[in-house]
Amino acid sequence: MAGYLKLVCVSFQRQGFHTVGSRCKNRTGAEHLWLTRHLRDPFVKAAKVESYRCRSAFKLLEVNERHQILRPGLRVLDCGAAPGAWSQVAVQKVNAAGTDPSSPVGFVLGVDLLHIFPLEGATFLCPADVTDPRTSQRILEVLPGRRADVILSDMAPNATGFRDLDHDRLISLCLTLLSVTPDILQPGGTFLCKTWAGSQSRRLQRRLTEEFQNVRIIKPEASRKESSEVYFLATQYHGRKGTVKQ
């Protein structure tokens, strides 16, 4: 069993099963179903036990366990960082807090429109819009060497309820972030972004293929089965000809 799944199982056993009936009183049917599912979710339970800010931490833990994208000494830009779960994982894996004196110390910078509570080992720009050129300049000023080795994006637009529109807006966010990689991402670097499967996914995949040596699609175990959520993992950044700044 993979390490992150062992962690989930152990955490689930520690917390055990609890009735959810009392918490569901006076709620609509849809609210009742959502709350019941949420409280029974092993990743929600594990996040609470392991002090992660939300269950999404296990998505990044799985990706990293399988593909080793984070290691001590790397500089990480976490886009859409609130509430900070991915930054927590990144801080641990790149040794940004310097807890392992025998390993290189990395750096984690999180950016979000929403407020993020402080986290030891991480620097946050918030509220800040990562698609705003002024934010890009601030990012460069904060990053050591004005470069990131890894760009993470768990960004998502506010849902409208119209699936195709939400998909198009998320793809647009990913493409906008990709457009600033020549200024920010170190050659040979890694780009991980969330999207919702749909008609524009191939457009994003083509762009990534033009700029990275390897591109793969990942559906982490912690992604809900009914969700169209997938992640593009692109490694070995080389950019399009003439776009990468050395």
Swiss-Prot record:
Principal location: mitochondrion
Annotated SUPFAM superfamilies: S-adenosyl-L-methionine-dependent methyltransferases
Record field: catalytic activity: uridine(1369) in 16S rRNA + S-adenosyl-L-methionine = 2'-O-methyluridine(1369) in 16S rRNA + S-adenosyl-L-homocysteine + H(+)
Catalytic EC class: transferase
Nuclease recorded as keyword: no
CDD domains documented for this protein: AdoMet_MTases
Tissue expression profile of the protein: Widely expressed, with highest expression in muscle, placenta, and heart.
GO MF assignments: rRNA (uridine-2'-O-)-methyltransferase activity
GO cellular component: mitochondrial matrix; mitochondrion; nucleolus
Superkingdom field: Eukaryota
Residues annotated as catalytic: 194 (proton acceptor)
Gene3D superfamilies per UniProt: Vaccinia Virus protein VP39 (3.40.50.150)
UniProt KW Ion transport keyword: no
Function: S-adenosyl-L-methionine-dependent 2'-O-ribose methyltransferase that catalyzes the formation of 2'-O-methyluridine at position 1369 (Um1369) in the 16S mitochondrial large subunit ribosomal RNA (mtLSU rRNA), a universally conserved modification in the peptidyl transferase domain of the mtLSU rRNA. This activity may require prior 2'-O-methylguanosine modification at position 1370 (Gm1370) by MRM3. Essential for late-stage assembly of mtLSU required for efficient translation of mitochondrial DNA encoded proteins; methyltransferase activity is not required for this function.
Family classification: Belongs to the class I-like SAM-binding methyltransferase superfamily. RNA methyltransferase RlmE family.
Protein name as annotated: rRNA methyltransferase 2, mitochondrial
Species name: Homo sapiens (Human)
